[in-house]
């Protein structure tokens, strides 16, 4: 089995790195010079993540080779210090990868079946302000989906917005807000989805605090945040079992109380 360097060890003072990573996220970007590019979040088998980008000159190559969900071996890539602007702050790694014409990428077999979702407790959202800095993953039950609304965006144009609410096993709720085509997609996904086990998973969303109000927003990088209804992962199966256990206990308590 091939040996790879750990993503957590990456720094710019070496140039011979050899990593095996999953393309956890991939989305389209426009660089400051106006040229198109791709952005990525790579994760290794240990769960360490790093942000990466490529420019227009090698766009087609990495679009073809680095497919979201696939695993790749990367060598001859560049490393620079992470950009701490909020838009680029998608991992906690101190460096970020630059893919260029010298970079070699080849597909490899998966090194892990882990979905690499790190679910945040709802209490942490309200009690730990540092969570505001980085994207978070959430799992909960969908309890309310509003109507699609049209509002003014920061660019001066109009966009669709959608508000919805999820709750955890302790019935604590968080309000969520999605924008643009993503809002429309979530609205379509949630048609007819209700009931005690309407479990949804949100990955890479941002915590937004305005005065004393906390909301969860999709990331300003279009295509980065994701929304899933009952995805086929172990965490959802465990969550569903806990819900049914809670319902069963509530019914037993009610029956015993009525005796």
Map each language-model feature to its residues.
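Single-stranded nucleic acid-binding proteins centered on OB/S1-type folds
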Residues: 1-259
């Amino acid at each position: 089995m091939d040996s790879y360097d750990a993503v957590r060890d990456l720094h710019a003072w070496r140039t011979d790195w050899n990593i095996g990573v999953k393309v956890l996220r991939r989305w389209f970007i426009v660089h400051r010079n106006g040229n198109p590019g791709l952005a990525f979040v790579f994760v290794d088998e240990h769960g360490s993540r790093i942000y990466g980008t490529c420019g227009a000159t090698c766009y087609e190559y990495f679009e073809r080779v680095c497919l979201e969900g696939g695993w790749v071996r990367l060598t001859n890539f560049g490393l620079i210090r992470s950009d701490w602007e909020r838009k680029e702050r998608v991992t906690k790694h101190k460096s970020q990868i630059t893919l260029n014409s010298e970079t070699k990428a080849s597909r490899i077999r998966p090194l892990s079946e882990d979905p690499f979702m790190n679910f945040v407790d709802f209490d942490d959202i309200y009690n730990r302000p540092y969570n505001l800095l980085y994207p978070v993953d959430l799992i909960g039950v969908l309890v309310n989906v509003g109507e699609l609304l049209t509002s003014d965006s920061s660019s001066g144009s109009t966009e669709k917005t959608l508000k919805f609410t999820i709750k955890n096993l302790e019935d604590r709720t968080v309000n969520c807000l999605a924008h643009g085509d993503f809002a429309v997609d979530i609205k379509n996904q949630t048609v007819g989805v209700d009931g005690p086990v309407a479990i949804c998973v949100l990955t890479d969303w941002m915590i937004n605090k305005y005065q004393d109000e906390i909301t969860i927003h999709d990331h300003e990088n279009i295509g980065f945040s994701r929304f899933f209804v009952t995805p086929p992962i172990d965490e959802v199966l465990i969550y569903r079992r806990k819900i049914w256990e809670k319902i069963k206990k509530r019914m037993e308590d009610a029956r015993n109380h009525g005796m």
